[in-house]
Amino acid sequence: MALPFLPGNSFNRNIGKERFHKSQHWGFCNNVRMLVSENKPGVGGDLLYGQKIKPKHSVFPKGDGTDAPSWVAFDKQVLSFDAYLEDEISDKRQEIFRIRYYKIYFYLEDDTIQVNEPEVINSGLPQGTSIRRQRIPYPPPNDDQFYTVYDFNINISVVFYGRTFKIYDCDPFTKNFLKKIGIKLNPPGQCPLDPYMKMRRETLEFVDPFRPYQSFDTLKRFIQYDGKVLRFFCLWDDSTSLFGDRREFVLHYFLCDGTVEIREVLPSNSGRDAMSSFLRRGKLPKYGPPGIYQPGQITDRAVLNVYGGLSEWRADGYLLDKYQLGKVEQDFYTDQDLSIGATINVWGRKVLLCDCDEFTKTYYRTKYGVDNFTPISCKPPHLPKIERKYPPYTGFGSEEDSFRSCVGLKPTPHRKNFKKFMELDSFGNISNILRYFGKLITHKCADVDRIFVIAFYLSDDTISVFEPIENNSGNAGGMFLKRSRVKKPGQEVFKSEFSEYIKAEELYIGATVNINGYLFILLNADEYTLNYMENNTDKFPYSNFELAIQKLKQEKSKSREITQVFAAADYNHTKVVPYNTFRDILMSITMGKLIDQELITIARHYRVPEIMDPDLAYLIARAHEKFKKNIFENFDMFIYNCVYEDREKKGVLPTKDIRRMCKSSRLPLDDDFLDCLLSRFEDKDHQINYEIFFSVLNWRMNPTPDLQAPPYLKEKCEDVWVGMPSPIPVKYVRYLDFLIDVYGLEDNML
């Protein structure tokens, strides 16, 4: 019973609609009025009464996420079904029907179907694509509709253009997809065997194939190994024959066809023709030379007889020998026969494989699992060197001159080491001269205090000795030994071998050197020499800081005693001690294990840097002297400019700004002197208090005493070099850092 049409009982069914137009059902076709489409809806897109629209494509259930079109969501997704077809065979006694196997591909993106028939060897049937990709309609009377994904399942039959295909299975992807869209899958079916193909297979199992049907396919090997060559370095030792020698070869084995090529490595000035090819490319027999074969004896197939051919084909032919009687079997070298250490027969010549390249090693390691590639030397064993004996030194000239006179008929001068001279000769500020200060070891009281400068020239290993001149010493001083090489003592004078000379490695602080019978003990060295020795620790091991520290670490059991001794020596708690105190403590603790060179190396590492800057009062006095000479008094202008530049009113300006003002106002000071003066007034932020700076420079307001020239002769002290060596290499040593690095002691333990 329907409700009465009263307010509150009726509902507006047009709420939410946006389309209210009528569909155009009628039109013209070839100027004839007719119904254009029966599938068009009514007003607003609603279906007419009793109207059912058939879906044109597969309708998939909606899921979560974005609604992408089917041609995007199912791109490159294909359902694969296995099917077969019973094809009737007429007018043939061997078979009544034949089972043909097919692959049905359903493309989800546009509901197209493709049917392919896999290839069967020697089937005699057209195979490949049976139905090209297209939308396939239902069989009549529903041929106005097309197959969709819901029409496929396992163990069903589908009709494509009158041919019935029975689907018996599908791939796992197809099964999962059909389950997801709600299709209940049938159990897989069994595909029947083709009776004719089964009969042929059983027949072929009992057939003895003829040899002419053997395959000689070399294309696969050629494509796989083309351009890949095994290379071995080999040796043919022919030294046992008359005028024979050892000859080196390079063997190339071509993997694409198993051929071998050998090329000879010709050394320079060998006397042989410049023909590197020793064996042209070809297969190498293992047992050669085999002899001379008759024409046609070496063939791939043996021809039994020639016949005229079949009458219907009108073509000539030949019969091949099935049993190949009398065929010559040849055994050639393959890659399995080649290895390092193997000896191969190259047409009667024994060739030893000594080594191979990296590609060959990788090939054998990958294919055969070979890991031993120990090479064999191709070089001949070294002949014992005949030592040439020379007559002894005559005593005239140098040993090198006597040697050169014995080498040839015409005496030639000795060739010096020019490369060493060019590398180690002095240039610029680099002198390449090691200078040591030493004393003469003698029992004469007058010569005990004599100091000498021993210079070693690295360019030619020569030594010169110079004695500084001292007033009222009783010694003339000057050159003690001119520059020359010094022989080591204890050598025979007249001998055939060269004498040994003093080298740079034998000179270090604390060493005793015998120079032509005079014994010198090296006491100290200049700064360049110490730096050179520390930079070349491979030649001067006593200047190696790590080795010296390692000796002290061996005395770790005495660390507490060493700490107490240093603490007692540093009674002012300055954490530094003089060098002599540092040396005496270490020498007493190590009991002579360290030499002076090692002590100096350690002391230089922990030394207190000396400030070499000139006195500020001296700099101001020099600046006032220059201002007086140039009558420069305009210092108030500098302060006014600085106040103008100081926008933040801090009273300080950057150093570069004050330097720019000084240069722009032509302050009569040199660049280096001005930089030195500015550095003495700048703070850690590189800023200068301009009022203090220019007030100090104002020689009118703040005069200083006149600058006095230093005396010509200055009293000798430890810090000034006047021709005599300084008695100590460094002034103070930071012993606290030394104890922390060597023994791991902390500051609070002292």
From Swiss-Prot:
GO terms for biological process: cellular response to leukemia inhibitory factor; flagellated sperm motility. Keywords: Cell projection, Cilium, Cytoplasm, Cytoskeleton, Flagellum, Repeat. The keyword Translocase does not apply. Residues 75-182, 226-368, 430-537 form the DM10 domain. It is found in: Cytoplasm, Cytoskeleton, Cilium axoneme; Cytoplasm, Cytoskeleton, Flagellum axoneme. Residues 557-592 form the EF-hand domain. GO terms for cellular component: axonemal A tubule inner sheath; axonemal microtubule; ciliary basal body; sperm flagellum. Microtubule inner protein component of sperm flagellar doublet microtubules. Microtubule inner protein (MIP) part of the dynein-decorated doublet microtubules (DMTs) in cilia axoneme, which is required for motile cilia beating. This is EF-hand domain-containing family member C2. It comes from Mus musculus. The gene is Efhc2.
